Amino acid sequence: MGESSRKPPTPTPEGPTVSVKQLFSTLPVRHKEFQRNIKKKRACFPFAFCRDCQFLEGSPAMLPVQPAKLTEPAKAIKPIDRKSVHQICSGPVVLSLSTAVKKIVGNSLDAGATNIDLKLKDYGMDLIEVSGNGCGVEEENFEGLSLSALKHHTSKIREFADLTRVETFGFQGKALSSLCALSDVTISTCHVSAKVGTRLVFDHDGKIIKKTPYPHPRGTTVSVKQLFSTLPVRHKEFQRNIKKKRACFPFAFCRDCQFLEGSPAMLPVQPAKLTVTGELRACRSWKTREGITEAVG
């Protein structure tokens, strides 16, 4: 073929082009939900999209009718250091005091605890301590406990398909890792087969830095000191919010920790105690009137 018959090369725009096809297609249920929501919101899609993408807020881009153009000077792509990655990824897992408590209590329930004691020192700013009479941790599993303090290490699931059979509160393998990254974590445990308990101290990377014999009844106690101390700005915000809400703290805390809703526990004046009776209740409240209202309407 002659030179005149060759097609001219397609002009390439400056900068990289990122194409994403079939978003959520690997998660069938989520993919269907995504498609259903998009179809419902077609009329207001441009406005809702610009609102959610805050950098497009106020933009006249009527997506997907016309594309939006953003200009940003190119910067070199470099890896984030491991410590920063650990702290950044831990933030969305533990969002608040109540989230931290729910994660720890959930682990206690998964371990078969029927009695759980919760103690907060200085409204949880100084110390969160959760003790449960579960099965405890065998010494041969201490290394596994250390691994569970690394992200995505758990005893609950092995592969994605296991999610359809999950019967536990925790399964992602993020809770202990995130707590270690955001605070000082100590775990005291005693397995039913052990003669004496053990205290394990973790560093912010989730590794065991100290292991000592410790008298402890059967079960496990998780102590979290100085929550959010590794994130100075968030730590100050956390302290400020707690101080602002001291008057209504017990009620707000019990509301956020749904398993404490309706509890008379005036935290942190007195510790809360949870007991698993095995009784199925359709209503979280123990008051007859509220139970009838929730059940009947």
From Swiss-Prot:
GO terms for molecular function: ATP hydrolysis activity; ATP-dependent DNA damage sensor activity. Highly expressed in kidney, spleen, adrenal gland, esophagus, duodenum, colon, bladder, ovary, cerebrum and cerebellum and to a lower extent in lung, liver, stomach, uterus and pancreas. Not expressed in heart. One of its GO terms (cellular component) is mismatch repair complex. Gene3D superfamilies: Histidine kinase-like ATPase, C-terminal domain. GO terms for biological process: mismatch repair. PANTHER family: DNA MISMATCH REPAIR PROTEIN MLH, PMS, MUTL (PTHR10073), MISMATCH REPAIR ENDONUCLEASE PMS2 (PTHR10073:SF52). Encoded by one of the numerous copies of postmeiotic segregation increased 2-like genes scattered in the q11-q22 region of the chromosome 7. Belongs to the DNA mismatch repair MutL/HexB family. This is Putative postmeiotic segregation increased 2-like protein 2. It comes from Homo sapiens. The gene is PMS2P2.
